[in-house]
């Protein structure tokens, strides 16, 4: 085969090993994703600090990278590498055959031109027999290489993929196991989101970087070395000449990788800011909507994606320059080699065959060097990604929950001693929490800890569970330092129930079973009865088999708390820790649960932390804490007699406890209004969500969302299941798979860029057919008139400079302008989609289909997937189509018989390309489904690691994780063999084409010499093969396009959704509110649980300036009233009026600007305290003095002032740097600074200690003056002064009136107050 065959082979090799430049882009993006979350400054801006840069380049060594492989796997790596090296060496050796067959065709053409004389100009006698012999030798060599390349592809890919999967499987298991054994202080600085990224993304990078691409890197390096050896041995002079251009080509190859890496990092880091906005906004959507923060979040997001777009355009610019330069340098090297080579052939110092062999070998070797760069970059990426993984794997926890060390032989009685304990949280070492704490609890005693927020009460529980170790002093149990007790043994003998319980996304039965191994059904039912949970569980459609949802969102707050209490009681622990265990229960439930807890406390040591003093008045010992120290100790009677801190706390509570319950569908629990439907539906939706997330994680590497290869029934079923889930998701979004025309329609604002890119791509499509004409014309010079040899040879050599200019310009323009169009489309769709999402009603977010993780995935991954449909890959498709049509036309012009043969063989080549795409497709579709369940388990365990460790269930979650990995791991091993088989086939079909084409060409020349002369055969062959050599570049587009059609269907479907309540709409009446509220026969059911009606004809009215208090049991509909007033939902029946206007006629945004809400569990944002207080307001309209005054009213100013950074202190993600009471007071300040006309208080003071509550309640009482206030509260002292108290039961009001009136009526309200007065006495 002639010289251009080696170039074509190089181009094919580029495609065959999936080294298209877009893969370099993917690799570069993956290099930085893991680090983006750690490089956000105090303003939420992305920064690249010195440490961040060092982290990015920190890599493990190659031996360390493979340290989790067995001896057998290392042997397979060696075999795979050896075959790859041999294969790489064989490719340049093929150039020798190309030189020989080229010389044979030239010789035969010379004989024909000499009118049958068999003597060549060199004097050699060259007969037909010689010609047949030379060509058939090459044909048989090609046939051998067809088989050899199939076997080589099979061995190399299978070995590497098998080893990569085995190693990755071990790493996944060990990584999760290592995470779960780390101490809690480590999690304070290593957020679950970052760990999840490492689990999914980093491990995928390691898998990719240790898989078949490394084999390809060895093959390219071998090809590079061998290529130059062959070149120097055939013509060292021409080799040196070509080396003048080769560095440029190699430089271009590395420039592509470098520019892609650099700008992909910039783009990804800039979008990290946007992704953070999305996650924070969607996960806290009720808070954002109620505070009118939507436009602020849209602006933040728009700014971030605009920055990402600019980085993407710069990426396209440098990519275009690099592509253009590389393509142009190829043709420049042709021109230089041919121009000089012609002279040497003319002088007799070089023959044509050696010239082409040298040229082919140098081109093949130099291109291999450039192609090895991206592959080695993938290895470098894996080394960098593995660094973060191995850092966790190698880290020895300070407190190792899996350690077997420590005493297990002791029979715990429950004596607890805290001796001179000093402690600060590692994440805030400058803020001391405990300052010499001393206390003693005797076995069997019930001890209560009371004090203001931040005094260190909950810290004692954390230290008892050994979440942390003390800095000074010690804590002992039965005289043994807790540090000397086996950790698992300790935690299995201690049970804790916290204020905000963590439930797992499984059934109620499975959640309770986590409390005790081997629990019987009888024990579970008994525990649920004690926790007052049995009754409500029986009312659920699936009883104990009811799925509780992500974080228990299918249950109300009180229901979640009772499940958590039951989970603790089944353990029958020696030590029971109750941290606000009944704070979320209504009075009726709390009374029963408290009795159960009182019974449970008998015979065991119990430590109670409670703001409601009625829950601790019967404690054996009450310990008052202040500023991290114990200030007084005694029982209730003794401490009341002392009239100290405890006395002050008690007297501040007129009534001690609850009337009401934790509201159904809590406002602050962002997804809590999602209701239980059925177990099957819940499972399918949750699986669908994880499928989507995992699919997006995997599809960010390579591949498409289509079926995998059909090998057997089981594999076919898995592929179909994955596709059916995707189709189901499209159906759930009322969408259909999109197409190119719809994508182009959405890109029409950028029509000019598209026109320039597509036009230059069309022009570029004629370059390769023109190249085939120029090249065969150059070859024909060697068989033509010797007198014109030199001039004609130089002429056609210089014509390649024309191609160089055309190719360079076209490559640059189409890459750059298609990049502009695609990046602009990405920006537009991200902004449109985010705006559309934020304009949806709250019921939209209650659906698991629209969980924050899914929406984040849509914006972060699906939109970029859509972009790939019209980026530079699309321009290569246009170029390829034009090139193929023009090339086939030329082939038929030169010789239709030969053209028909080659075209007949092309489907086999296309099938090979299909197998390659199919290979990647199957891999990614399976990844979407196979790892879904395991990923869900891992993420949930990591996010709730405190609960997991407190339950001593690390092994349970680890085993569940491993169990879910088994089937996908086995499928991946099978897939390694299938991929090797298909890859070997794809790698060999092109050699089969050459075998058949040269054999038929020889037959045509012999049988029909007048029509099919050697040069006509070559013109036909090169017209098609050169023109179709770009097919390899184009094939990388179609897997991406398949992803784009699925992603686009979902995205465009979402964009077509019109919200029932558009929070961003300008429509509706904008009136100044005075505060009159009327509910008239309102009926309502949550969208996710339409069969359960919450409000059943609720009616009431509140005059301007009045305060209405709503009390009643859990699930009666109190918090639903708040949600409807905020117009999170619309009623199913009845009407709601504000100042005489039906709420549906009012502009939602304007109305909410005059309403403020404070909920039980406030949501704070990861910004400063001041920014949290003024969130949703125009910063220019609020002075710092107003902020400080609001903080004073909320009794938080002094605390803020004592912080090192004051109001500029960042509160952490969801306010994690603050205690519950501190977060609540900031939320109250946030409400007060708004000066609302209507104030909604949903358990506004429930999280506050009594001392703080007294001051805050006074502030709220003052804040109520002159405005309408609707209060939901457990503590009756917060509602007794209300103008009207309404008792809600089963969705209706059963009695209402003032405190005095209701007390005189001696109804439901009276009974509750009497109960509390009895406790008070």
Curated annotation (Swiss-Prot):
Compartments (UniProt record): Membrane
Tissue: Intestinal cells.
Keyword terms, alphabetized: ATP-binding, Glycoprotein, Membrane, Nucleotide-binding, Repeat, Translocase, Transmembrane, Transmembrane helix, Transport
Binding site for ATP 2: 1112-1119
Glycosylation sites: 115, 125, 190, 850
GO molecular function, one term: ATP hydrolysis activity
Residue ranges crossing the lipid bilayer per the database entry: 78-98, 144-164, 213-233, 240-260, 321-341, 350-370, 754-774, 798-818, 874-894, 895-915, 978-998, 1017-1037
Catalytic activities: ATP + H2O + xenobioticSide 1 = ADP + phosphate + xenobioticSide 2
Ranges of residues in domain ABC transmembrane type-1: 77-381, 754-1043
Family: Belongs to the ABC transporter superfamily. ABCB family. Multidrug resistance exporter (TC 3.A.1.201) subfamily.
Protein name: Multidrug resistance protein pgp-1
Organism encoding this protein: Caenorhabditis elegans
């Amino acid at each position: 085969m002639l010289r251009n065959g080696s170039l074509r082979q190089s181009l094919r090799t580029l495609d065959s090993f999936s080294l298209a430049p877009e893969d370099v882009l993917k690799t570069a993006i993956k290099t930085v994703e893991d680090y983006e979350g750690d490089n956000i400054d105090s303003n939420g801006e992305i920064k690249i600090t010195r440490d961040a840069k060092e982290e990015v380049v920190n890599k493990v060594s190659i031996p360390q990278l493979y340290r989790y492989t067995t001896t057998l796997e290392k042997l397979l790596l060696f075999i795979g590498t050896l075959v790859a090296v041999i294969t790489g060496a064989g490719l340049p050796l093929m150039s020798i055959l190309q030189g020989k067959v080229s010389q044979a065709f030239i010789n035969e053409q010379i004989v024909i031109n000499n009118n049958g004389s068999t003597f060549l100009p060199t004097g050699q006698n060259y007969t037909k027999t010689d010609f047949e012999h030379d060509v058939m030798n090459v044909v048989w060599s090609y046939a051998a290489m067809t088989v050899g390349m199939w076997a080589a592809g099979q061995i190399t890919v299978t070995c590497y993929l098998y080893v990569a999967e085995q190693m990755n499987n071990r790493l996944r298991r060990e990584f999760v196991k290592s995470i779960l054994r780390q101490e809690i202080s480590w999690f304070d600085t290593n957020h679950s989101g970052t760990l999840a990224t490492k689990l999914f993304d980093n491990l995928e990078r390691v898998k990719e970087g240790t898989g078949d691409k490394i084999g390809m890197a060895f093959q390219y390096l071998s090809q590079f070395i061998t290529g130059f050896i062959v070149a120097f041995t055939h013509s060292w002079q021409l080799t040196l000449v070509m080396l003048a251009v080769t560095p440029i080509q190699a430089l271009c190859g590395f420039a592509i990788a470098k520019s892609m890496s650099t700008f992909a990092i910039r783009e990804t880091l800039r979008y990290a800011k946007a992704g953070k906005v999305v996650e924070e906004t969607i996960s806290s959507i009720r808070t954002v909507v109620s505070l009118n923060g939507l436009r602020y979040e849209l602006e933040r997001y728009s700014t971030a994606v605009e920055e990402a777009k600019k980085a993407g355009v710069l990426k396209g610019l440098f990519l275009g320059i690099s592509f253009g330069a590389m393509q142009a340098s190829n043709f420049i090297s042709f021109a230089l080699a041919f121009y000089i080579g012609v002279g040497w052939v003319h002088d007799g110092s070089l023959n044509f065959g050696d010239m082409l062999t040298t040229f082919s070998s140098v081109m093949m070797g130099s291109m291999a060097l450039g192609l090895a760069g991206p592959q080695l970059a993938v290895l470098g990426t894996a080394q960098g990604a593995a660094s973060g993984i191995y850092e966790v794997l190698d880290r020895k926890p300070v407190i190792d929950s899996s350690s077997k060390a420590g005493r297990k032989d002791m029979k715990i009685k429950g004596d607890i001693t805290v001796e001179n304990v000093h402690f600060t949280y590692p994440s805030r070492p400058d803020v001391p929490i405990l300052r010499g704490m001393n206390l003693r609890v005797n076995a069997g005693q019930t001890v209560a800890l009371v004090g203001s927020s931040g005094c260190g009460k909950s810290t004692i529980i954390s230290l008892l569970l050994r979440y942390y170790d003390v800095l000074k002093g010690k804590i002992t149990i039965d005289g043994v330092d807790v540090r000397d007790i086996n950790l698992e043994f300790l935690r299995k003998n201690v049970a804790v129930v916290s204020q905000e319980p963590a439930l797992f996304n499984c059934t109620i039965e499975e959640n309770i079973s986590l409390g005790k191994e081997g629990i019987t059904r009888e024990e579970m039912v008994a525990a649920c009865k004690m926790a007052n949970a049995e009754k409500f569980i029986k009312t659920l459609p699936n009883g104990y088999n009811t799925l509780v949802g992500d974080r228990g969102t299918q249950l109300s707050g009180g229901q979640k708390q009772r499940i958590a209490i039951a989970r603790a009681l089944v353990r029958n622990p020696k030590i029971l820790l109750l941290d606000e265990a009944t704070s979320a229960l209504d009075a009726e439930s709390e009374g029963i649960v408290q009795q159960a807890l009182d019974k449970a406390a008998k015979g065991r040591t119990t430590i109670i932390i409670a703001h409601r003093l009625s829950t601790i008045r019967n404690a054996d010992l009450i310990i008052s804490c202040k500023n991290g120290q114990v200030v007084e100790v005694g029982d209730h009677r003794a401490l009341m007699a002392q009239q100290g801190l405890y006395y002050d706390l008690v007297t501040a509570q007129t009534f001690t406890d609850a009337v009401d319950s934790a509201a159904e569908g809590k406002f602050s629990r962002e997804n809590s209004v999602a209701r239980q439907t059925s177990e099957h539906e819940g499972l399918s939706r949750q699986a669908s969500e994880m499928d989507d997330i995992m699919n997006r994680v995997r599809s960010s590497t390579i591949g498409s969302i289509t079926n995998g290869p059909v090998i057997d029934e089981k594999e076919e079923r898995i592929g179909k299941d994955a596709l059916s889930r995707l189709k189901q998701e499209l159906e759930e979004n009322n969408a259909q798979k999109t197409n190119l025309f719809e994508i182009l329609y959405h890109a029409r604002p950028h029509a000019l860029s598209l026109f320039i890119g597509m036009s230059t791509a069309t022009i570029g499509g004629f370059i390769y057919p023109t190249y085939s004409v120029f090249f065969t014309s150059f070859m024909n010079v060697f068989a033509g008139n010797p007198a014109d040899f030199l001039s004609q040879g130089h002429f056609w050599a210089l014509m390649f400079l024309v191609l160089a200019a055309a190719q360079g310009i076209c490559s640059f323009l189409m890459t750059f302008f298609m990049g502009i169009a695609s990046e602009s489309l990405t920006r537009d769709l991200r902004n449109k989609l985010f705006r559309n999402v934020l304009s949806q009603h709250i019921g939209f977010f209650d659906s698991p289909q629209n969980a924050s993780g899914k929406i984040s995935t849509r914006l972060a991954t699906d939109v970029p997937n859509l972009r790939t449909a019209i980026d530079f890959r699309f321009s290569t498709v246009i170029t390829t189509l034009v090139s193929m049509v023009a090339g086939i036309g030329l082939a038929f012009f030169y010789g239709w018989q030969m053209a028909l043969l080659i075209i007949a063989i092309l489907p086999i080549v296309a099938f090979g390309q299909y197998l390659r795409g199919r290979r990647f497709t199957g891999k990614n579709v399976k990844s979407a489904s196979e790892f879904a369940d395991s990923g869900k388990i891992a993420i949930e365990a990591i996010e709730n690691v405190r609960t997991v460790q407190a339950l001593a269930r690390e092994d349970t979650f680890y085993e569940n994780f491993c169990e879910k990995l088994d089937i996908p791991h086995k499928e991946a091993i099978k897939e390694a063999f299938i991929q090797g088989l298909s890859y070997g086939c794809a790698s060999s079909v092109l050699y089969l084409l050459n075998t058949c084409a040269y054999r038929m060409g020889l037959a045509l020349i012999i049988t029909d010499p007048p029509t099919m002369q050697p040069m006509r055969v070559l013109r036909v062959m090169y017209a098609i093969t050169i023109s179709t050599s770009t097919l390899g570049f184009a094939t990388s587009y179609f897997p991406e396009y398949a992803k784009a059609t699925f992603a686009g269907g979902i995205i465009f479907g979402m964009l077509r959704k019109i919200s029932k309540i558009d929070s961003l709409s300008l429509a509706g009446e904008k009136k100044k509110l005075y505060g009159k509220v009327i509910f008239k026969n309102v009926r309502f059911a949550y969208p996710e649980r339409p069969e359960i009606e919450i409000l059943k004809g609720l009616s009431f009215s509140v005059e301007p300036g009045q305060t209405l208090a709503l009390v009643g049991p859990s699930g009666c509909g109190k918090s639903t009233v708040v949600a409807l007033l905020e117009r999170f939902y619309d009623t199913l029946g009845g009407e709601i009026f504000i100042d005489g206007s039906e709420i549906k006629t009012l502009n939602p945004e304007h109305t909410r600007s005059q309403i403020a809400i404070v909920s039980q569990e406030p949501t704070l944002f990861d910004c400063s305290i001041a920014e949290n207080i003024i969130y949703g307001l125009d910063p220019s309209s609020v002075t710092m003095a107003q902020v400080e005054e609001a903080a004073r009213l909320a009794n938080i100013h002094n605390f803020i002032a004592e912080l090192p950074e004051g109001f500029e202190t960042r509160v952490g993600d969801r306010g994690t740097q603050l205690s519950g009471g501190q977060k609540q007071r900031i939320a109250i300040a946030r409400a007060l600074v708004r000066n609302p006309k209507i104030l909604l208080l949903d358990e506004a003071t429930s999280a506050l200690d009594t001392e703080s509550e007294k001051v805050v309640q006074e502030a709220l009482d003052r804040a109520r003056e002159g405005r309408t206030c609707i209060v939901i509260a457990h503590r009756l002292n917060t509602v007794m002064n209300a103008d009207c108290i309404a008792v809600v039961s089963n969705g209706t009001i059963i009695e209402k009136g003032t405190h005095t009136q209701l007390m005189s009526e001696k109804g439901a309200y009276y009974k509750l107050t009497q109960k509390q007065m009895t406790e008070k006495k």
